[in-house]
UniProtKB/Swiss-Prot annotation:
InterPro entries: Alkaline_phosphatase_core_sf (IPR017850), BPG-indep_PGM_N (IPR011258), Metalloenzyme (IPR006124), PGAM_B_sf (IPR036646), Pgm_bpd_ind (IPR005995). It comes from Myxococcus xanthus (strain DK1622). Its cofactor is Mn(2+). Gene3D superfamilies: Alkaline Phosphatase, subunit A (3.40.720.10), BPG-independent phosphoglycerate mutase, domain B (3.40.1450.10). Pathway: Carbohydrate degradation; glycolysis; pyruvate from D-glyceraldehyde 3-phosphate: step 3/5. This is 2,3-bisphosphoglycerate-independent phosphoglycerate mutase. One of its GO terms (molecular function) is manganese ion binding.
Amino acid sequence: MTPAHKVLLCILDGWGIRQERDNNAIVLAGTPHLDKLASPYPFTELQTAGLAVGLPEGQMGNSEVGHTNIGAGRIVYQDLVRINRAAESGELAQNPVLRAALDGVKADGKALHLLGLVSPGGVHSSMDHLFALLKAAKERNVAHVYVHAFLDGRDTPPQSALGYVEELERFLHETHTGRIATVTGRFYAMDRDKRWDRVHQAYEALVFGRGPKAPDALSAIRASYAEKVTDEFVKPTVLAAGDGTPVGRIQDGDAVIFFNFRADRARELTQALAFPEFKEFDRGGLRLGRYVCMTQYDETFKLPALFEPDQPQDIFPELLSRQGLRQFRTAETEKYAHVTFFFNGGREVVYAGEDRHLVPSPRDVKTYDLKPEMSAYEVTAELVKRLDSGKYDFALVNFANPDMVGHSGRLDAAMKAVKAVDECLGALGKACERNGWVLAISADHGNCEQMVDLETGEPHTAHTLNPVPFHLIHPDFRGQKLRPGILADIAPTLCKVMGLPQSKEMNRQGLLP
């Protein structure tokens, strides 16, 4: 079929709406290109957090959740909600995969290691899930249980780990369910950009007990703060007795459960610990007894998971493919999974008629505040070429800058990131105009519109609960009104714009009247 309109959907990652100017990188930077493009055309606000995207009430959204909802055209209830319900009801403790792992490690007389992000952020993990796993291990009489605590500082304030780790230590002491064995910033343990040198340092601490030593977790964190190293960047630290013996390193035959429910930042460490073949660094011949993921981290990983994927059917990209339309996806490395895997409903699939292009994120800087433009200009150049080719009917692009630089807490850098993305929008607006495309601009969640925590005065490095914009830019829609909505309204809206039949499973009415 021939669509009524061809559409470019731009997702400005971490670009929320907040009216106040103070510490608002978007307002302070100014967006002259976006303002010029969007001013004559319809605009509305979309909710991106809590129940609106299938998360618990008051829980901030994230890129994984956002892109899944955008592609599905309905509210997709997230793993966090599913696992919360299982933990609260006792269903988790009866999970057959969990019981097999616990009974196996007990029978073997080996240790159980629980790895994951100790954080209330709710983006990658939940402390309630960790507590439920610890209780289950005690109920199954597992004798040796160790927690390897990864510290946040991105989805939480940058120096907030002491409170969360103290809560964990209190729980462990009161319930006699285990001990903390290592403390590591997520910068090392949760890389997703193939920076294997970081993962290697985490592995060395987990498996060999190598790295800085500390008598307990709180001392390790305080020592890092004294060196002006915040939670995210705490070096992999081994908790050890007075003679230097590690509290609990991962050894041959042990069992590991990675309790992060979000996949993208759990994959690399999982590969290092559990894959039979691995060539990125010398692992020293570790052979685990069991390795269990909280969720399915990748369809190609032949590893058991406590919760299998709940994948939405008849989603927007699938609809495009069935109609014989050509689609193009692009982003830089940091957000490439979001415009592919997550937009495709959590599937490792390339639909018929779907082309992709990955632009590498910068690797010459440690953090992106040092290069706020990241790879936005390269992404834009490739996308303009594809729009001008006349080959496609739909295109999706994600600009990572507002989110990735926003996570640094550096207002000046975030403003530069905003300016770079605004320039790119100007170029894309011109390309859409000369090719007759509709330009739809939105975001998956907020971030850089609030760079300082209003309560503490510290840098704000997490996502926000703020709504995000939705612009529909094309002369055919001048003067039309858009309803306020949620991210799941985007796909039904694009179906109407393109003249496509909306699937029954897309149960949202969209934003157009």
